[in-house]
């Protein structure tokens, strides 16, 4: 049984090793072992310890239960992005660094496909705007009543330079994926309008800061419209933007490459449930593809719908004064 499980783990390591990478080199880096020790494990001469197997699953994004054949067919394992809620900024920065590493890896594969259906503005657009990022995090802090109690207003929240840099870096690598599909509905900018109005009325943000955020929302709209007209990001990678005719109840995404499959289900604003489970991947992918049938493609086509949509969103943002 041990030999069979170890052989299955070795097979999974080879299957999830990125193209043009050496599995032995990856083991040396991930497990902090020497070259000969890495090759002995890959040849099956030395079995992997449970700790080593667990670390490899986390780094290489595959399910240990499924590798060793222990996964129950009626149960799925998810990883919650945020498990600790007492140090949000530090935790969020660590998650960003892991996400950047993952997106950098999958972006190197020309077959990579990244798809999202969401009722909120995705980070691949707002993530490069410092104040929009800051408000998103401030709102999260306030809703969960965590973080520094001295940060009572938006203006008092200062994001570390490393976090701001990682937010922009994440956007860069997400947009480096070969093909992106994004489905959203009419409510995404309305959500920002409602939140900013509410926080302003509670004296949690000043009118001056609201105007700064308004200007960044306008700038993001200009960027999104340019992307929609061209059907590609500034770097030339393709993006298919769909406008849903029905309201989207939550946010779902999947990424697929020649070696990886993973999904994320959004929850609690910045949080999410993640899993590489192949069955859940098929469910989420099918759900997103189904949503596209109730949507209009506005990137590179659908000109009238696209013009009307962006005109309406600018009218919504203008209500911020």
Q: What role is predicted for each listed range?
A:
Residues 1-79:
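Basic, Lys/Arg-rich alpha-helical nucleic-acid-recognition elements, primarily the DNA-binding modules
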Residues 320-321:
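Long, charge-rich alpha-helical interaction segments
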Residues 16, 20, 103-106, 110, ...:
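Short secondary-structure junctions and interdomain/linker hinges
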Residues 73-149:
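Helix-turn-helix/homeodomain-like alpha-helical modules used for DNA recognition
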Residues 136-312:
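Hydrophobic protein-protein interaction segments
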Residues 1-5, 34-39, 112-115, 126-138, ...:
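Charged, low-complexity, helix/coiled-coil-prone segments
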Residues 3, 17, 93, 207-214:
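Generic detection of long, well-ordered alpha-helical segments
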Residues 8, 12, 26, 37, ...:
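Exposed alpha-helical structural elements
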């Amino acid at each position: 049984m041990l030999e069979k499980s170890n052989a299955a783990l070795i097979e999974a390591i080879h299957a999830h090793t990125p193209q043009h990478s050496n599995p032995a080199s990856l083991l040396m880096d991930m497990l902090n072992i020497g070259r000969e020790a890495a090759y002995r494990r890959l040849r099956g001469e030395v079995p992997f310890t449970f700790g080593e197997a667990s670390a490899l699953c986390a780094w290489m994004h595959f399910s240990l239960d499924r590798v060793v054949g222990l996964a129950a067919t009626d149960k799925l394992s998810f990883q919650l992005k945020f498990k600790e809620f007492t140090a949000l900024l530090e935790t969020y920065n660590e998650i960003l660094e892991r996400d950047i590493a993952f997106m950098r890896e999958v972006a190197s594969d020309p077959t990579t496909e990244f798809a999202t259906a969401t009722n909120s503005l995705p980070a691949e657009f707002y993530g490069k705007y410092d104040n929009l990022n800051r408000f998103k995090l401030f709102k999260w802090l306030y809703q969960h009543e965590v973080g520094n109690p001295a940060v009572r207003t938006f203006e008092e929240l200062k994001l570390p330079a490393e976090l701001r840099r990682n937010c922009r870096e994440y956007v860069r690598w997400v947009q480096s994926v070969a093909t992106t599909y994004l489905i959203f509905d009419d409510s995404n900018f309305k959500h920002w309008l409602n939140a900013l109005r509410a926080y302003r009325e509670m004296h949690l943000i000043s009118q001056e800061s609201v105007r700064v955020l308004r200007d960044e929302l306008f700038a993001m709209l200009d960027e999104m419209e340019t992307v929609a007209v061209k059907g590609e990001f500034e770097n030339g990678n393709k993006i298919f933007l769909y406008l849903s005719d029905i309201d989207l109840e939550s946010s779902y995404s999947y990424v697929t490459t020649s070696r990886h499959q993973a999904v994320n289900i959004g929850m609690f604003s910045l949080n999410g449930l993640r899993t590489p489970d192949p069955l859940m991947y098929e469910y989420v992918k099918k759900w997103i593809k189904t949503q596209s049938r109730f949507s209009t493609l506005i990137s590179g086509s659908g000109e009238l719908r696209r013009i009307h949509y962006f005109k309406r969103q600018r009218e919504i943002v203008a209500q911020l004064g």
